[in-house]
């Protein structure tokens, strides 16, 4: 029998005894006034019975833990610790699970002392409902009173920073009442005690995987065009091997189809369905196969991991050897880009072929070769190259009259064969002969147009014999015309 029931039974027994001994004490007002002597004899017993009834009807809750705590509060902008007497109550028919605190003052420390001291002496009462508790964690970084440990009790409304001499002795019961069903204290308190248990420190496994290397996944074949062609339907077992995916019967070990990983075009999972697209080289032929399974994401990750491992074993499939480009050194020796050589006039050997450089490219790429030019063009380019490499001469409009003349003599003193009016020389026939220096005298001599063409006429008379008279007459008229222009103004080449 509990204490409350026992007190109630004792109170009822005393009341019955009092009613039997003093029958006149019925409790009515009129009778009490008529028999005052009987009232005086019954009053002490009634007072004792009333006190027992008050105790039995309002029994005191017994806390599961009580003691001194320190609670942090802010006073005038400064954090202070207040010493309180804490009472931890469990939930029951008479109240909810809560943590009550009374400020400790002079006149009493315990709950009984505080009650007898009165409201002015026991201080303010604070209640924290454990049903509103969110977390209970140790607060090692907080400064707290000496020989105490701080812990943070967070509720839905605010956070309470408490400190106790034995922190875990308070955190454990609070967590058991605030988080029923967990069976243990919060993770923070467990972590706080883990170094004290002497556990061996462990390291994380970097290659840990939650799925098996060779997994078997029960699936249901979805209806697709490829599945209908292969006559696949109903439940089956999808087995992931090191090199291929096998489809087996649901209640047997016979393999129905096999799809090598390197023959799969695509694969993926979406909303509980794993699907892949097989290539033409698969035994089932090309097409889309779909399988419904609750572990479709795990199946997709397993296939991706198997493909990655197979790629590591066969690096030559993913790393093709680069084909080196042919270098310019592997070709026949050519002239330096941008430089042309002058070929002496005369027939070329039939075995030698002259290559023409179209456009120089980078040194690491093969040179681009153009078509073989004709003899006239090669002589023209050679003449231009020679004139560009020498000192610049006077350029003017009338130097092109040399085209009408025959080619001068060669370096060896032998005259070149004369050209016919409608024929070309079989050898190189440059516009300006390379063997004759057409540069005029230096600045000390006369460099006017009239003097230059007179010099040209003298050379024609000395070197050329048998010239047609029309050309000589034409040149004479031209010299006369130029002399007239000279009198009118400076020649175009003399203008700045």
From Swiss-Prot:
Renumbered residue ranges of the record's region Disordered: 18-38, 313-363, 408-447
One GO biological process term: cell surface receptor protein tyrosine kinase signaling pathway
Superkingdom per UniProt: Eukaryota
InterPro entries reported in the protein's UniProt record: Docking_Protein_DOK, Dok1/2/3_PTB, IRS_PTB, PH-like_dom_sf, PH_domain
Modified residues annotated as Phosphoserine in this record: 194, 330, 364, 425
Topology within the bilayer: Peripheral membrane protein
Cellular location(s): Cytoplasm; Cell membrane
Phosphotyrosine: residues carrying this PTM: 381
IRS-type PTB domain mapped to chain residues: 213-317
Domain PH: 63-179
This protein's record includes keyword NAD: no
Tissue expression per record: Expressed in spleen.
One Pfam family it belongs to: IRS
Keywords: Cell membrane, Cytoplasm, Membrane, Phosphoprotein
One annotated Gene Ontology cellular component of this protein: plasma membrane
Family per record: Belongs to the DOK family. Type A subfamily.
Protein name from the UniProt record: Docking protein 3
Source organism (scientific name): Homo sapiens (Human)
The gene coding this protein: DOK3
């Amino acid at each position: 029998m509990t204490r409350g029931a026992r007190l109630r039974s004792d109170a009822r027994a005393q009341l019955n005894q009092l009613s039997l001994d003093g029958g006149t004490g019925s409790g009515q007002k009129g009778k009490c006034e008529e028999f005052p002597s009987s009232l005086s004899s019954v009053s002490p017993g009634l007072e004792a019975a009333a006190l027992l009834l008050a105790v039995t009807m309002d029994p005191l809750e017994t806390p599961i833990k009580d003691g001194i705590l320190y609670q942090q509060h802010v006073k005038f902008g400064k954090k202070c610790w207040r010493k309180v007497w804490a009472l931890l109550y469990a939930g029951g028919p008479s109240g909810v699970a809560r943590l009550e605190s009374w400020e400790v003052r002079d006149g009493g420390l315990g709950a009984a002392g505080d009650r007898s001291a009165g409201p002015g002496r026991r201080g303010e009462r604070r209640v924290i409902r454990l049903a509103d508790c969110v977390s209970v964690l140790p607060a090692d970084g907080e400064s707290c009173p000496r020989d105490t440990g701080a812990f943070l009790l967070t509720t839905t409304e605010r956070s309470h920073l408490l400190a106790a001499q034995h922190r875990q002795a308070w955190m454990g019961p609070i967590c058991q009442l605030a988080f029923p069903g967990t069976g243990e204290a919060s993770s923070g308190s467990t972590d706080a005690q883990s170094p004290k248990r002497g556990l061996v420190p462990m390291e994380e496994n970097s290659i840990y995987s939650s799925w098996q290397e060779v997994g078997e996944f029960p699936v249901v074949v979805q209806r697709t065009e490829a599945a209908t062609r292969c006559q696949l339907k109903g439940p089956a077992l999808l087995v992931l091997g090191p090199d291929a995916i096998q489809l087996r019967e649901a209640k047997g070990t016979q393999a129905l189809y096999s799809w090598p990983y390197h023959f799969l075009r695509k694969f993926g999972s979406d909303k509980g369905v794993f699907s892949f697209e097989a290539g033409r080289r698969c035994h089932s032929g090309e097409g889309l196969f779909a399988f419904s399974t609750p572990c479709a994401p795990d199946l997709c990750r397993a296939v991706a991991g198997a493909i990655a491992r197979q790629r590591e074993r066969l690096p030559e499939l993913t790393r093709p050897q680069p084909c080196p480009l042919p270098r310019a050194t592997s070709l026949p020796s050519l002239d330096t880009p941008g430089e042309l050589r002058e070929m002496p006039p005369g027939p070329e050997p039939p075995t030698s072929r002259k290559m023409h450089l179209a456009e120089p490219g980078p040194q690491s790429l093969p040179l681009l070769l153009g078509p073989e030019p004709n003899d006239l063009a090669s002589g023209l380019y050679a003449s231009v190259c020679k004139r560009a490499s020498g000192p610049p001469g006077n350029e003017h409009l009338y130097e092109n009259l040399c085209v009408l003349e025959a080619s001068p003599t060669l370096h060896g003193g032998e005259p070149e064969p004369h050209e016919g009016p409608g024929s070309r020389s079989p050898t190189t026939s440059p516009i300006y002969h390379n063997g004759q220096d057409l540069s005029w005298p230096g600045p000390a001599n006369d460099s006017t147009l009239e003097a230059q063409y007179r010099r040209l006429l003298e050379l024609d008379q000395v070197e050329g014999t048998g010239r047609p008279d029309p050309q000589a007459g034409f040149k004479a008229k031209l010299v006369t015309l130029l002399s007239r222009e000279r009198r009118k103004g400076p020649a175009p080449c003399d203008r700045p």
